Structures are given as C-alpha cells and as structure tokens.
C-alpha cells in the first residue's frame, strides 16, 4: 500500500500499487515523501555521492516483508517536464513508475541487462497509464 505526505491524484497511488503487486506478487508498504530541492540534494549526496538534486530516490528495506521509502522532488520534476517536453503529470507518472520498478528490484545503474528490461517495462506502464490521454 502506498501512502504519501502530499495530496496527489489518487490514480497515481493506485497505479503504483498495481505495478508493485504485478512485479512483486504481493502488497508492499511504500511511503511516498515529497521533499524540496535542498533535501533531495542532501540525500543524493549522502547516499549516492552525487552533489546535485535529482527527481527521485528510492530506498528498499527488508527481504520478506518489503518496505520502501520514495523521496520525490516536485521542482526537479517540473524542470524535467520542461526539458523533455512533457506535461508535469506525465513526468510525475514516469518518476513514480520508475521508483516502483526500483522497489520491485530493477536496477539500471549496475546491471545493463536489468536496465534494458527496466526501461522496457517503464515504457509499457507509461502507455498503460498514460495520464495525458486517459
């Protein structure tokens, strides 16, 4: 079950729950936390040694009883939406799908085979849940 500290369209949480259930096969507790640019830059530096803000960071805990925290920065998502000629809604959906796939165990930084599969799945879910055309 996905919970959040910010009021967002209910569909986003439903989509994340569906992806997690499909990919993992069971319910997962996920805390979706919206934070500012300074805080996400601090976390990115602390955990990835990258001294810059990012759109999303995902942390997964446990093996059998999975729990995850997903930190999202709206300001970076807005910037990326402009940069990639997306609506904010589509960019947010992209980030949340991406994070859900990380929770499900996909990794694009250290495993190139897994990265290809992850980005294919990300595109499939983007088409399925296309917020700009639903």
Swiss-Prot record:
Protein name, per record: Endoribonuclease YbeY
Classification via InterPro entries: MetalPrtase_cat_dom_sf_prd, YbeY
Disulfide links within the chain: none
Positions contributing to Zn(2+) binding: 98, 102, 108
UniProt record similarity statement: Belongs to the endoribonuclease YbeY family.
Gene Ontology biological-process entries: rRNA processing
Main location: cytoplasm
Transmembrane region(s): none
UniProt keyword list: Cytoplasm, Endonuclease, Hydrolase, Metal-binding, Nuclease, Ribosome biogenesis, rRNA processing, Zinc
Cofactor(s) the record lists: Zn(2+)
GO cellular component: cytoplasm
Cofactor note as given: Binds 1 zinc ion.
Molecular function GO labels: metalloendopeptidase activity; RNA endonuclease activity; zinc ion binding
Listed Pfam families: YbeY
Location of this chain's protein in the cell: Cytoplasm
Alphabetized Gene3D superfamilies for the sequence: Metalloproteases ('zincins'), catalytic domain
Entry keyword annotation includes Zinc: yes
EC number of this enzyme: 3.1.-.-
Entry function: Single strand-specific metallo-endoribonuclease involved in late-stage 70S ribosome quality control and in maturation of the 3' terminus of the 16S rRNA.
